[in-house]
């Protein structure tokens, strides 16, 4: 039996029996894990086992199953409402459906923290949209699914600002095609320049297709709440 202490966020919760809760936690140390919290229905634990509360969780592993030993909050719940709330639910669903269990990635964990704190503070929708696009790219990288914004996918030639390209999921950008994206936009996105609404719109279009390819047909319910992506 091994015991570990983790920085964690609740991604999903399901009641189990009369007293327990089955949790899916996103942690810095172990990545996404499934964990059984005995006594999870007590008022104290119910107040902690919510999304968007940073937690310090002590767990033990028995017979390939994680069990919580102690749960504490390290700060108050993030103040998310409206579009910020739906965006937070969106990125939680992305983690739930795309990450393999027990695969830690500190860069993705940091991106998650940065995004949550950013959307909690953001007052404009475009600022939230930019944060979501950057998180989606971090998630794609963590899942090993990346493509170049600087080179044409099939020839390897440099993207030309005045040319137009089509995004092909699983490949990248090819010259021409029906749904054309200006090369200027691709180069701006490559430079992390989402300051122009046109660049942000193209980034949203590209990431939507890339994320859908990664999801493999699984539905993200938060999209229907407010259309964050």
Curated annotation (Swiss-Prot):
InterPro entries: DNA_rep/recomb_RecO_N (IPR022572), NA-bd_OB-fold (IPR012340), RecO (IPR003717), RecO_C (IPR042242)
Keywords: DNA damage, DNA recombination, DNA repair
Origin superkingdom: Bacteria
TM helices/strands, residue ranges: none
Entry annotated with the keyword DNA damage: yes
One Pfam family of this chain: RecO_N
GO cellular component entries: bacterial nucleoid
GO process terms (BP): DNA recombination; double-strand break repair
Family recorded in the similarity comment: Belongs to the RecO family.
Functional summary from the UniProt entry: Involved in DNA repair and RecF pathway recombination.
PANTHER family: DNA REPAIR PROTEIN RECO
Protein name (record): DNA repair protein RecO
Primary gene name: recO
